[in-house]
From Swiss-Prot:
Superkingdom to which the source organism belongs: Eukaryota
Localization per Swiss-Prot or TrEMBL: Secreted
Pfam families: Cecropin
GO cellular component, one term: extracellular region
Protein name: Cecropin-D
GO BP terms, alphabetized: antibacterial humoral response; defense response to Gram-positive bacterium; innate immune response
Signal peptide: 1-22
Keyword Cell wall biogenesis/degradation carried by entry: no
Stimuli inducing this protein: By bacterial infection.
UniProt organism field: Bombyx mori
Prodomain positions: 23-24
Free-text function comment from the UniProt entry: Cecropins have lytic and antibacterial activity against several Gram-positive and Gram-negative bacteria.
The entry's keywords: Amidation, Antibiotic, Antimicrobial, Immunity, Innate immunity, Secreted, Signal
Length: 61
């Protein structure tokens, strides 16, 4: 009986450690990549926004 409790406990510990991702620094890399994507999207959208602003000014003026 005692052996089965120890076996279940060891199995639970092994399962818990196998299912946990051990990369806490990876979150910050993903966050940095997301920020870079947003920055790149804003930079690439700038010419389109300028064109729309010029078209709006042309239409009003």
């Amino acid at each position: 009986m005692k052996f089965s409790k120890i076996f279940v406990f060891v199995f639970a510990i092994v399962f818990a450690t196998a299912s946990v991702s051990a990369a806490p620094g990876n979150f910050f890399k993903d966050l940095e990549k997301m920020g870079q994507r947003v920055r790149d999207a804003v930079i690439s959208a700038a010419p389109a926004v300028d064109t729309l602003a010029k078209a709006k000014a042309l239409g009003q003026g």
